[in-house]
Amino acid sequence: MASPDWGYDGENGPEHWCKLHPIANGNNQSPIDIKTSETKRDPSLKPLSISYNPATAKEIVNVGHSFHVNFEDSDNRSVLKGGPLPESYRLRQFHFHWGSTDDCGSEHLVDGATFSAELHLVHWNSAKYPSFADAASQADGLVVVGVLMKVGQANPNLQKVLDALKTVKTKNKKAPFTNFDPSVLLPSCPDYWAYFGSLTHPPLHESVTWIIFKETISVSAEQLAQFRSLLANAEGDKEVCIKQNYRPPQPLKGRTVKASF
């Protein structure tokens, strides 16, 4: 999905995305600032059922604006069910967003507060669509689980991922990344918010049911620095660190944010 026509600063930055992607000003854009006093508890929201098989972890790829850990998604070995979802959704990849300093980096805010980073686990509706690409633009196509990350203690569960970054230092590099269960990165408290929104970078499809955990996970300053050491350039080109890769919050435009708690 990465293309040279967008980025996170200057004339390619988020406020200019609408020139090439008019949906950037749509009614269901993400991320948002979750105002807790305006969320609605929904008793019909069931607990999430998350079942990830570590054998489906496949590779890590530098996509130029972040890195993706990709999963084998030709079967239902790694799926998300329950919560607000009518179907089971298959895990495709996870990635992170971060900032140039420790006091920013998350895409979602809670009552105006920003966090140091954010983990996104991307799933697609395999019950209804033949592939991730087919699902990605459909209103019921995707579910992204978001986990807010707060600077503090080092998080040992992140270490395997961070250690792999040196194998994909530059854009388009990929390396095997196997035997990993990303549920170790989830908070222990099951409470979450849910709302309908979009991908947070171009093509910005309004195709995402968002599930944002209330509880944060920790990440240390040193671990955040490892994210920022990743390079946006291809091998041999002038070195440019990926210092920040988050989109500012978008207007809610009448949407309801539901709470499971």
UniProtKB/Swiss-Prot annotation:
Keywords from the UniProt entry: Acetylation, Cytoplasm, Lyase, Metal-binding, Zinc
Name of the protein this chain belongs to: Carbonic anhydrase 1
Enzyme Commission number(s) of this protein: 4.2.1.1, 4.2.1.69
Family: Belongs to the alpha-carbonic anhydrase family.
One of the Pfam families matching this protein, by short name: Carb_anhydrase
InterPro entries per the UniProt record, alphabetical: CA_dom, CA_dom_sf, Carbonic_anhydrase_a-class, Carbonic_anhydrase_a-class_CS
Catalytic site positions: 65
GO molecular function: carbonate dehydratase activity; cyanamide hydratase activity; zinc ion binding
The keyword ATP-binding is assigned to this record: no
Modified residues (N-acetylalanine): 2
GO CC, alphabetical: cytoplasm
Root EC class: lyase
PANTHER family named in the record: CARBONIC ANHYDRASE, CARBONIC ANHYDRASE 1
Residue ranges occupied by any Alpha-carbonic anhydrase domain in the UniProt entry: 4-261
Cofactor: Zn(2+)
Main location: cytoplasm
Region (Disordered): 22-41
Subcellular location: Cytoplasm
UniProt-annotated binding residues for substrate: 200-201
Activity regulation: Inhibited by acetazolamide.
SMART domains reported in the protein's UniProt record: Carb_anhydrase
Function: Catalyzes the reversible hydration of carbon dioxide. Can hydrate cyanamide to urea.
Binding site for Zn(2+): 95, 97, 120
Catalytic activity, reaction form: hydrogencarbonate + H(+) = CO2 + H2O; urea = cyanamide + H2O
GN (gene name): CA1
